[in-house]
Amino acid sequence: MLSEETIRVIKSTVPLLKEHGTEITARMYELLFSKYPKTKELFAGASEEQPKKLANAIIAYATYIDRLEELDNAISTIARSHVRRNVKPEHYPLVKECLLQAIEEVLNPGEEVLKAWEEAYDFLAKTLITLEKKLYSQP
């Protein structure tokens, strides 16, 4: 479970995410593909809209972080998409590293916000990995 403090901090970032979300996610993809070129294969065929789609997902997550049941359908859809693209648990730390670096570069928000986003990312990653494991095991 996420701490109340993390939830408060994440929710406080929603206005900044609405303003700079696509800039953050575009930078995250730049970092990810330059540091870990093999990850580009996971996004083969993804549209140019992918940074905007991810930004919208992050904004929704931050907005509903205190009511995650509101995102159950969206999280299930993301998990199915990840399985189609062959996303594995070992990819999550790479994305986390690049996302946190992008947040730091674009927003320069300070340690409290970065720590909260790290905790929130880990929580969501664990949820997705669990769902994806079930999907991968289905015939």
From Swiss-Prot:
Taxonomic path: Bacteria, Pseudomonadati, Aquificota, Aquificia, Aquificales
Keywords of this entry: Heme, Iron, Metal-binding, Oxygen transport, Transport
InterPro entries per UniProt: Globin, Globin-like_sf, Globin/Proto
Protein's UniProt keywords contain Iron: yes
Family of this protein: Belongs to the globin family.
Organism domain of life: Bacteria
SUPFAM superfamilies cross-referenced by the UniProt entry: Globin-like
Gene Ontology terms for molecular function: heme binding; metal ion binding; oxygen binding; oxygen carrier activity
Domain (Globin): residue spans on this chain: 1-133
Pfam family, one: Globin
Protein's name in the database: Uncharacterized globin-like protein aq_211
